[in-house]
Amino acid sequence: MSQPYLISKWMDPLFGIFVGTYGYYLYEKEHRPRGRSLRELALRKWNKQAVSQQSMKN
């Protein structure tokens, strides 16, 4: 018995990726407090690692 698809065999995964990405975008834009977005958290982590690597070199 073949599996049922919402749209088609190839469009279902693309639709899932689109919905997930859009949901993530909305969460980042609306529900995260200022200063806590993924971009800001990643930059903070990156800067922290860069400082620790420079202190190890000196």
From Swiss-Prot:
User: Its GO biological process terms?
Assistant: exocytosis; protein secretion
Mind telling me which residue stretches traverse the membrane in this protein?
A: 10-27
- The keyword Nucleotide-binding is annotated on this UniProt entry: no
GO cellular component labels: membrane
Please give the name of this protein: Non-classical export protein 1
Q: Which PANTHER family match?
A: NON-CLASSICAL EXPORT PROTEIN 1
Q: Which family does it belong to?
A: Belongs to the NCE101 family.
Stated membrane topology is: Single-pass membrane protein
User: Which keywords appear in this protein's UniProt record, sorted alphabetically?
Assistant: Membrane, Protein transport, Transmembrane, Transmembrane helix, Transport
Primary location group:
membrane
Q: Which domain of life is it from?
A: Eukaryota
Compartments in which it is found: Membrane
Q: Name one Pfam family in it.
A: NCE101
Function recorded in the entry: Involved in a novel pathway of export of proteins that lack a cleavable signal sequence. May be part of the export machinery or may also be a substrate for non-classical export.
Q: Which InterPro entries does the record match to this protein?
A: NCE101 (IPR024242)
Q: Does the keyword Transmembrane helix apply?
A: yes
